[in-house]
Amino acid sequence: MKFTVSSSSLLSLLATTGKVISNKNTLPILDYFLMELKGSELKVTTSDLETTLSGSITVDAVGSEGTIAAPAKLMLDSLKEFPELPLEIEVNDQNWEIRINWKSGKLSIPGASAVSYPAVPALSAEHREITLDVDTLIGGINKTIFATADDELRPVMNGVYINFAPQLLTFVGTDAHKLVKYEAKTETDLTASFILPKKPANLLRSVLLREEEAITVGFDSKNAVFKLKNHTLVCRLIEGNYPNYNAVIPTANPNKVLVDRIELVNGIKRVAVCSNPTTNLIRMDIGENRINLTAQDIDFSVSANETISSSYDGQEITIGFKSTFLVEILANIETPTVQIELADSTRAGVFKPVYDDEQRSTTLMLLMPMMINA
């Protein structure tokens, strides 16, 4: 195995695929990059047995093809120290030594045989397949992933639920305290769903930022495959039935507030400094053209209050929210103005972005209230 490659191109590929590698691998070989050279294409694969990511680049001056397992940390640490320059990489097929040569020096890294590297799971013959544009997939993941849980007892809530329906694609994330539903119009007639784990969802976010072409998504009952231009991600899906999220979204919300999002976020942050550190409770008294924010910590005799101007249609209402969740919800809405819909102090608040024109997607965020002590 022998070829020449740009140092920056190789580092970029290894850094991206290296995000899969776990700090607690059960198999020593999983601490390695699987590097395969066929023709002028260098393919690099990493896996943690649950998620597998591969990427490829074009290399020059190919002397011979081959496959090797290269130690991930050593390869990354070495390549980070190089400026942009051509590297000649040669592998000794007898002892798996990896030699990296450049204009003014060389280094040697011990590799390993790739024979024991785990095979990539294959989809069943009954798998489904769909093509999605980058903006739809990255938009759905970005909007919902922050609301997913870390709950060993309810693993189905630890991922992003993706539901395909005729002309509509829905992404949902929830941890039982907050819920986000993102819907986008599509041109598919597919009816299916799966739960994407958090780790591959985050990996897709980072890889998709550099993609422009459409993505092919294939899946069966156990695994999903995301095929991009230069990368392929294969992951095991979360098994189980996702909660009926539509049942918890209140539909009759007569009280509606329009408020400047940044002004509200900044007000919450200032007032929340004086909230109880255990509950982070912040009280919202909503009335005509104003939202009054209050927080206090009785144990330390501290309190804060601020009034935010708003446009309000409804009855006066008092409701409590966890300030950290409230800030998180508002931080994931990108419009200058946000609409808050409320039924009463015991039901969830619904948060929606306010757009100036019609959108191909809609976002709904829900936050459960907290009890306010009289």
Model-derived regions, located:
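Structural preference for solvent-exposed beta-strand-turn elements
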Residues: M1-A374
